[in-house]
Structure formats: C-alpha cells, structure tokens
Amino acid sequence: MTNIRKSHPLFKIINHSFIDLPAPSNISSWWNFGSLLGVCLILQIITGLFLAMHYTADTTTAFSSVTHICRDVNYGWLIRYLHANGASMFFVCLFLHVGRGIYYGSYTFMETWNIGIILLFAVMATAFMGYVLPWGQMSFWGATVITNLLSAIPYIGTTLVEWIWGGFSVDKATLTRFFAFHFILPFIIAALAMVHLLFLHETGSNNPSGLNSDGDKIPFHPYYTIKDILGVLLLILILVSLVLFSPDLLGDPDNYTPANPLNTPPHIKPEWYFLFAYAILRSIPNKLGGVLALVLSILILALLPLLHTSKQRSLMFRPITQILFWILVADLFTLTWIGGQPVEYPFIIIGQLASILYFSIILIFMPISGIIEDKILKLY
C-alpha cells in the first residue's frame, strides 16, 4: 500500500512542496528567508484578524478604537504591537530575500522573479494602507502626501486622486476603502506566494555557487525543515524582544496624536521601510520625475535578468561585482537615512548623489563589471 502522503490528492501537494522536495545540499541560511516570509504573512493575517474584530474604520472612532484595543482588550497591546512590528520584520526578511536573489543570480528564474516583484509591490501597498488605519497625524498626512503623488500623472491625475479619495480630501470614504483593501490584500499575497512557489518548484532552488545542483540533491525534510524551524525561532525571538522591550522604536511619535487636517506635522515621513524610495522621490525637483523615479526604484528589479552580462550566475566568484553589490547595499542604507531627514542642505545633495549612484550601479556598473570579469577569466 502506498503511503497516504504520496497518494492523497491534497497531501501529495504538501509532500512535493515541503517533504520529498529535492533541494540542493549546499544552500546557506540566506535561503531561510522564503519560509520566514511565510511565517510573517501568517502572523500578520492572524494578528490582523484579531485587530479587525475591535477596530472601527470611521474617522471619528478609528483612533479611539486603537486606543481601546491597547487599553481594554485582553492582550490587545500585544496583538497591536506584534502586528505593527511584524510588518517591520516582514520587510527586513523581504529586503534580505531580494538581496539574496540579486547576489546569487536567482533572478534568472524569470517567472519566479517577476511574481516576486508583484509580491513586493503588493506588500508595500498593504503596509502603506495599514499605516493609515490608526488615523494618527502621520497616518492622515502620509495618506494625503502619497496619494497626491498620483496627481502628477498628466491629464487624468487629479481625477484619479479624487477617485481614490472618494471625495475632495482624505476622509471617511478613504479610510473605509483602505481598511477593505488592507484586509483583502494579504489573502491575495498568500495566493501569489503559492504561485511564486509553484514556479520555483518547476526549476528547483538556486544555490550559492550558481551551478547546476541536479547531481547533488537531498530531501527537504528533515534537513531544511529543521533549518527553517531554527530561523523561525530566531525571528520570533527578535520580534518578541522588540515588542516587549521597545514596541515604539520603529514608529513615529506623531501617530499618537489624532489626525488633524488643519495642522501639518513639521516632517512628514513614511515608515522606515519606505524611506529609501521616499529619498529617491524627494531627490528629483520635478513632481512627475520624482514619481517615475519612485516607481522605477522598485521596477528596476525586473530589468536585472536583461542586464546580466556575466557567464557566471552567482557573485560567489566575481569579486568586482561583489564590491559593487556591497556599495549598493551601503547606498540603500544612506538613502534610508536621508529619507528620514528634513529637506535642507546637506541632505538634499547627499540624497541626489545616492539616488544617481543607486541607478548607476544597477544599470551601468554591474553589467560592465560582468563583462570585465569574463574578459579577466579568458586571460587565464
């Protein structure tokens, strides 16, 4: 008799994805982030569901309902801070996951990579709308500033913004629809993540060397299930430490002031995970140009497979491109720092230089270094 996990239609899918899946024997801890993102998503859906039971999407009561959750609901403060800081952990894992993909050349799996980019946009949209829901000062003004960027689109811009707002300003209609979208999007993300995995399992995983690993595969379970559990425990340790010791470390104090359309905060800025893109947006003096740069800062990832010039897939044996990669990482840290600073000298010029460097490394220097490295290899 065949084992039920190999014969049952439902268990068979799980078996082929998480148990008998052939995996390369040399994948490092950088391959843990896929499973960590899955854990983050599940955590966000569960905590979000419990928050939605007590939250009211109305401008008059939204702020009070969040306060009520923190003060009166059993462990409401814990659920709220797990959800808020869980989003930060989600983005940490997301950035490391994408960085791993760039470093080891995983973007050559075109379908998997492109769905990953769609996932990144979906998660960013979800996080943005979630930030609006507590209806604090930064929620309101963040929503106003970011949605207003769409007015830069020629001809239809203003109409589009008013259509999204459901009126002539960010108000009750905006809050209600943002709550609806914030609730539905994580389930769409979960579905997309399954498609992401489906395409990945068509090709099999990449590995640090970037070479074909078909000759040396091991079963996913028990080796990588145990390895993933260790990663999950470390993730939970960091998240719980953050929630219990410093829950407001990554938040903005302005969001503890109820939204007031008549009073603009001195520095409007998004959550830390959007600051790099916000810095790129602000570094261009033209509104439409800034919006295009903002979108392209993420969309540029879709060009990576086309910009790959090297005969080698991974950066493991490519020292020149390695240096460029780490300069790019440092540049992203710089942009994140600049995004949180006021718009004044010297921050403006630093942001502009960092933005130019960001696009130059990806579009010009990395493809050239790939060609140079191939030529150096030919000499030997």
Curated annotation (Swiss-Prot):
Belongs to the cytochrome b family. Keywords: Electron transport, Heme, Iron, Membrane, Metal-binding, Mitochondrion, Mitochondrion inner membrane, Respiratory chain, Transmembrane, Transmembrane helix, Transport, Ubiquinone. Binds 2 heme b groups non-covalently. It comes from the Eukaryota. The chain crosses the membrane at residues 33-53, 77-98, 113-133, 178-198, 226-246, 288-308, 320-340, 347-367. The lineage of its organism: Eukaryota, Metazoa, Chordata, Craniata, Vertebrata. The keyword Membrane applies. Its main location: mitochondrion. It is a multi-pass membrane protein. It comes from Macrotarsomys bastardi (Bastard big-footed mouse). The gene is MT-CYB. This is Cytochrome b. A ubiquinone binds at H201. Component of the ubiquinol-cytochrome c reductase complex (complex III or cytochrome b-c1 complex) that is part of the mitochondrial respiratory chain. The b-c1 complex mediates electron transfer from ubiquinol to cytochrome c. Contributes to the generation of a proton gradient across the mitochondrial membrane that is then used for ATP synthesis. Heme b b566 binds at H97, H196.
